[in-house]
Amino acid sequence: MTDRFQLVSPYSPAGDQPAAIDKLVANFEAGLAKQTLLGVTGSGKTYTIANVVQQVQKPTLVMAPNKTLAAQLYGEFKSFFPHNAVEYFVSYYDYYQPEAYVPSSDTFIEKDSSINEHIEQMRLSATKTLLSRRDSLVVATVSAIYGLGAPEDYLSLRLILSIGEHIDQRQLIRHLTDLQYTRNEFELTRGAFRVRGEVLDVFPAESDTEALRIELFDGDIEQLTLFDPLTGETLRKLQRYTVYPKTHYATTRERTLSAVDTIKEELKERLEQLYSQNKLVEAQRLAQRTQFDLEMMAEVGFCNGIENYSRHLTGKAPGEPPPTLFDYLPPDALLVIDESHVTIPQIGAMYKGDRSRKETLVEFGFRLPSALDNRPLRFEEWEARSPRSIYVSATPGPYELRESAGEVTELVVRPTGLIDPVVEIRPVGTQVDDLMSEIHERIKLGDRVLVTTLTKRMAENLTEYLGEHGIRVRYLHSDIDTVERVEIIRDLRLGKFDVLVGINLLREGLDMPEVSLVAILDADKEGFLRSTGSLIQTIGRAARNLRGKAILYADKMTRSMQAAIDESDRRREKQVEYNLEHGITPESVERPISDIMEGAREDAAEKKSGKGRSKSRQVAEETPDYRAMKPAEIAGKLKSLEQKMYQHAKDLEFEAAAQIRDQIQKLKTASLA
């Protein structure tokens, strides 16, 4: 383990990268609060940021606009920093239906959710890493601005164990129970412990492949060992170990009982208000629901929907922002906002949507007013908590440019020598027939084509029309979930089909070097989908191919089109000059087609397993392709496989158990995106 970032890469910075890295680092070390990295597609933005992290040596949080891009970034940073703590923090819900009330139909919708236990483990690992290591880099989504347990409580509850320390076994068991660990003598699963004489085995909640064995002798800790919970194989011996709570929302018994008292006071005040307004049904409903929750909290320390009482549990004042992942960041950390033109507006939108739903619940007696404080951060609260930041985008928005106050670092020259796609304008009247002839030309070359339309109806009709004319085409629409979207893009790259039609789903996203043509239909219809930024982003999808071309079908030149074409021409000229000066011949990007998380998860498993795990453990045979499975199917399959794995381990059939573990690892990988 090291406390310094160690960048591992087979190549050195080139093109605009050295100057960009130097400028970003100099600005950061000079204390500049905000700066922008304007990087075109294929210019090596992630590699540039990795070099900045290596030089500034600060804990880093990277925010991405969605799980797909977060997964890709996680894999890339994991390969750049294999010896450091690279973590993944996204929403752990495979499915989430928040509780809501529809007054017009008098319909109450109960909260319903499905939690991905593997992502929950990665979230716990991320917060533990931020609190315990300086060489931590966390890739997160907007989930980072939602409420977590307070870091003070999280730290105060932790159990620190050292060789030679005197500790009573009953006290140790009680402390583990306070951390919400469960005792299970039959099966050692994540978040559980077992007792065998003076030996305690604990499977830490944030660990995926390692468990802790605590050996006591006459009340002293004689030995601390990390071992494989499946085979019992010893991985390494330790002098010291810290066990963190099983959940971010763990709190002390005293704090819970204190919260029960303050909730009772709030309930009394709220009932008086409702009775004074003659809202008898609402008052009765609120009293009944809250009393039930209070009884559960007093008896077992937990209740369904306990997050709605988070203000009382954290001791915050009304209106105060909840603790979030940003509270776990040290003050000198670095924040990187990837695709900032999308991520920044997302952050501002989260609070408003959440507030509207909860106000209805409070008004009609389903929740106490304090439930309004279980919320994401407001935009201004997020700004106040953000450390020194770098906004990264090919098309920075007005907010980023304003906040950076002119400190914009350009990353326009690509080390590969690739030039921005040629942009052509063609008339709308013949756009479909012209597009078909272009598609046939690209198919002959073995390339792929992206087509973006303005409406869902047009996308459906175009997909049907192209299909009728023998073209292998798919339509990427908003109803497709993240995992399936990744699968479709992968199939496009593999050549299972040649043309992908979409509306607003092809702008920011995964790298597709096989795409040599981007067609933008009705490019002269001004609006969000045809703004300057959207056009530049869409054109950029063809920027990784030597034959890259973008066709804008339009009957008139709009300001957005002109600005996008001018910017594209400027970038082309700069790249051509660089190529001539350095004698570079452009080449298409060669990027292996694989699962976006595959390499990262393998690296993580190897790192967490330690050197004690022999190579012969990787004995899994070919397993089914799980990537297209729905979250509910994945959860069910995981439970079934885990039961089989533990049964094999009980029967001492460790090789069979290891095979199933490898299947489980592939299944978890498929669920991450």
From Swiss-Prot:
Q: Could you tell me which residue ranges the Helicase ATP-binding domain spans?
A: 26-183
Motif Beta-hairpin — list its residue ranges.
92-115
Which CDD domains does the UniProt entry name for this protein? DEXHc_UvrB (cd17916), SF2_C_UvrB (cd18790)
First and last residue of the signal peptide: none
Q: Which residues form the UVR domain?
A: 635-670
Which keywords describe this protein according to UniProt? ATP-binding, Cytoplasm, DNA damage, DNA excision, DNA repair, Excision nuclease, Helicase, Hydrolase, Nucleotide-binding, SOS response
Q: Where does this polypeptide localize?
A: Cytoplasm
Q: Name one GO biological process term.
A: nucleotide-excision repair
Name this protein carries in UniProt: UvrABC system protein B
